[in-house]
Amino acid sequence: MKILAFESSAKAAGAAILLDGTLLGETFLNSGLTHSRTLLQMAGDLMRTCELKPCDIDAVAAAAGPGSFTGVRIGTAAAKGFAWGRDIPCYGVSTLEAMVRGAAMCDGIYCACMDARRDQVYQAHFAVLDGKLHRLCPDRALALDELYEDLKNIEKPIFLVGDGASLCYNSLLDRLPELRLLPEHLCQQRASGVALAAQAAIDAGNVGDAAALVPNYLRLSQAERERNEKLKREVCNLQK
């Protein structure tokens, strides 16, 4: 099975192709260019390099969040469009799970974290045992102090991955000496991790439905928060 995967949930973007569980090829760009300009081009270039045509792809996947609202929308829209045009399965996977699948090099506890701004991180942690990934909590948005409370009773090394790894490490190391910061190249969101997460979903018997793929933002966008605050003020004014 050939899986084409998109990752555009943060600053970097990429595409990857997985062939029967083995990475066939991957592109990665961290130049700051707009994902809407680069993502499909990278996927097309990768398929040509691998001597594949769009009709050769058996399934498509995208990082469905959490992450940048715009980036997640671009990636999921690209995956859904590709799937609908070819009538193939489409999988939306957790950005956090994909990061751990792409970075885990040994058994242990992995804490995936993305900088969510406003003194928060998008976070989930996982255990890797005998090479198999086990989720320990749902994806969520946490303040750093809340993350500390959640991790403080773990008495094993905790490997940090994601673009929020350095933030968590620098903020919490004094209180959590078990923290371990993985090298920078392993902390980036990668399309290969998305492909591996999609392969795991397929192996588990999940059916990828493009119509059911929706972004998982975990919290409201800034525009939505501002609109809600405006509505609250208007309601308060009406009640005076």
Per-segment meaning from a language model:
Residues 22, 34, 89-188, 217, ...:
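Surface "functional belts" at beta-alpha junctions
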Residues 50-55, 106, 152-156, 202:
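Glycine-rich phosphate-binding loop signature in dinucleotide/nucleotide-binding domains
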Residues 182-240:
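Acyltransferase
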